[in-house]
Swiss-Prot record:
GO terms for biological process: protein complex oligomerization; protein folding. It is found in: Cytoplasm. This is Chaperone protein TorD. InterPro entries: Chaperone_TorD, DMSO/NO3_reduct_chaperone, HscB_C_sf, TorD-like_sf, TorD/DmsD_chaperones. It comes from Escherichia coli O139:H28 (strain E24377A / ETEC). Involved in the biogenesis of TorA. Acts on TorA before the insertion of the molybdenum cofactor and, as a result, probably favors a conformation of the apoenzyme that is competent for acquiring the cofactor.
Length: 199
């Protein structure tokens, strides 16, 4: 990626981690439709690989603002997609896609991190991968740890995530009838792909 700084990419990962970790509350719902978010989306669209995915997400958000009981409907979408059985869902866990659930634990140890006791989900949850990527991008921007070491860990994390993220996105698109989480997952997919290619 050329125009976004390491800190900006870190913020995108942290934002996506938050949205995939729990249902949106009223404040978050107001925030994603705000003028401030529109500016942020405009910045993201300056990155050509992200433009189409951001446009799709903005269209979903515009539709969301006129949806009756938007928060409750989104909560139902979140629950149906991420908390139910895997028959008609997109479970946000590496282990749901036959991946090694211990890999993220090894990566966290290597980064000197651990999961928070406040997050009551298994360590192989998508949000943990995204928080780790956010942390690594912030670290790149700070310059306190050798960039080569951080970049190596970033590439390992991206590779581990890429093993199952495309299938997760397909399932989001298949089972999210409204499309908000499908659009969000598509943005994540192109972000990870661009980040992975930016060695």
């Amino acid at each position: 990626m050329t125009t976004l700084t390491a800190q900006q990419i870190a913020c995108v990962y942290a934002w996506l981690a938050q949205l995939f970790s729990r249902e949106l509350d009223d404040e978050q719902l107001t925030q994603i439709a705000s003028a401030q978010m529109a500016e942020w989306f405009s910045l993201l669209k300056s990155e050509p690989p992200l433009a189409a995915a951001v446009n799709e997400l903005e269209n979903c958000i515009a539709t969301l603002t006129v949806r009756d009981d938007a928060r409750l409907e989104l909560a139902a979408d979140f629950c149906g997609l991420f908390l139910m059985t895997d028959k008609q869902a997109a479970l946000p866990y590496a282990s749901a896609y036959k991946q090694d659930e211990q890999e993220i634990k090894r990566l966290l140890v290597e980064a000197g991190m651990e999961t928070s006791g406040n997050f009551n989900e298994p360590a192989d949850h998508l949000a943990i991968y995204l928080e780790l990527l956010s942390h690594l991008h912030f670290s790149l921007g700070e310059g306190t740890v050798p960039a080569r070491r951080i970049d190596s860990l970033r590439q390992k994390t991206l590779t581990a995530l890429w093993q199952w993220l495309p299938e997760f996105v397909v399932r989001c698109r298949q089972y999210d009838s409204f499309g908000f989480y499908a659009a969000l997952s598509q943005l994540l997919l192109v972000l990870v792909e661009s980040d992975h290619q930016n060695r």
